[in-house]
């Protein structure tokens, strides 16, 4: 009988080295940034992020050793029903995470005993179940993917989830879902003419959709592209973030240096890229971008090497999350994109978003491990 150590090493070898290295580097960089700003963020943020990191790596190891095909094939209906249920519960009983004056109801309190209050953002975890169920749905109808009734079914599937998120007021997360949907459909071979028709429909529907947005959401978008128009209101965060980045210069103010980030709201979450740049300069910001780029490229390579359609689509969906959230997170910090409440992957402090990212990386590890297993079987 093999020892636990031997079995552990064998399971560890199933994990992809590049993915693991990138995840480790980004996690360490996040902890280092929060540690350097502990006087401003508070020790609780550091302790929470440290705990989420350890739990996250355990989840990566756990999920990487699960057969993703068996998991999704067995649970995809339950995953979809759970997603609808938890988003509906959040819509009915949710609270705003940061600003109670907004109509955002994207957080759900699960523990509220005395001074102990634990809230989660279900839409972050639903990203995982949505990618799994949408990939499964596409794989079931791939032979008739360009038939209108097939696409209608896929749009209903996606529309239920995105609609519930929009109703909760979480515009930023809804946009990430939209990007995931488009990339997964594109990679599944949907005709380009459907995308052209979709863009035309969006342009026609835009004036009506605009009226459906809450006033604070409209303001975020309008002043997001030009924060100078409202420097003491909606544009203030973006402009302060931009100042923090400029204050960092090329090499930064040091781990415990910098001052602009101290007054910047959400400097440990949505605007943590500004904190990174003020402390570690252009070099630190560029380093983060390079590591994320390597991570995304590796995920795409794993998708390209996968012979299973569902595995491919899972990886492409995960890559969409990293691409969109990184671009939006950096764009917000540079004051060139609207502030829509998007966390920076493996950098922003937080429980829900951090654990969700570790879980989806675990799924990519699983896809890679299963492909290796079947590859060796074919070689033999």
Regions found by a protein language model. Give the residues of each.
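Membrane-helix boundary/helix-loop-helix interface segments in multi-pass membrane proteins
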Residues: 2-13, 18, 32-168, 320, ...
């Amino acid at each position: 009988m093999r020892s636990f150590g031997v079995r552990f090493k064998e399971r560890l070898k199933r994990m992809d080295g590049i993915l693991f290295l990138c995840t480790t580097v980004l996690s360490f960089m996040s902890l280092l940034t929060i540690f350097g700003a502990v006087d401003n963020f508070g020790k609780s943020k550091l302790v929470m992020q440290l705990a989420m990191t350890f739990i996250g790596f355990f989840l990566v190891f756990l999920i990487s050793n699960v057969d993703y095909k068996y998991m999704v094939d067995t649970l995809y209906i339950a995953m979809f029903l759970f997603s609808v249920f938890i988003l509906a519960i959040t819509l009915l009983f949710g609270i705003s995470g940061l600003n109670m004056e907004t109509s955002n109801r994207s957080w759900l309190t699960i523990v509220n005993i005395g001074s102990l209050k634990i809230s989660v953002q279900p839409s972050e975890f639903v990203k995982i179940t949505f990618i799994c169920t949408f990939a499964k749905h596409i794989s079931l109808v791939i032979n008739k993917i360009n038939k209108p009734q097939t696409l209608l079914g896929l749009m209903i599937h996606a529309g239920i989830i995105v609609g519930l998120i929009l109703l909760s007021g979480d515009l930023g997360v809804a946009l990430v879902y939209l990007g995931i949907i488009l990339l997964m459909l594109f990679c599944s071979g949907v005709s380009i003419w459907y995308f052209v028709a979709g863009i035309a429909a969006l342009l026609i529907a835009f004036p009506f959709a605009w009226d459906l947005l809450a006033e604070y959401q409209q303001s975020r978008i309008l002043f997001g592209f030009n924060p100078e128009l409202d420097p003491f209101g909606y544009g203030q965060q973006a402009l302060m973030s931009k100042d923090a980045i400029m204050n960092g210069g090329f090499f930064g103010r040091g781990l415990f240096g910098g001052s602009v980030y101290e007054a910047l709201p959400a400097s440990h979450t949505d605007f943590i890229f500004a904190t990174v740049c003020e402390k570690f300069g252009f070099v630190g910001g560029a380093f983060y971008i390079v590591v994320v780029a390597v991570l995304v490229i590796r995920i795409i390579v794993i998708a390209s090497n996968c012979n299973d359609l569902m595995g491919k689509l899972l990886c492409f969906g995960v890559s969409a999350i990293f691409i969109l959230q990184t671009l939006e997170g950096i764009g917000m910090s540079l004051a060139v994109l609207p502030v829509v409440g998007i966390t920076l992957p493996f950098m922003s402090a937080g429980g829900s978003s951090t654990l969700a990212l570790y879980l989806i990386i675990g799924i990519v590890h699983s896809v890679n491990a299963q492909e290796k297993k079947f590859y060796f079987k074919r070689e033999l």
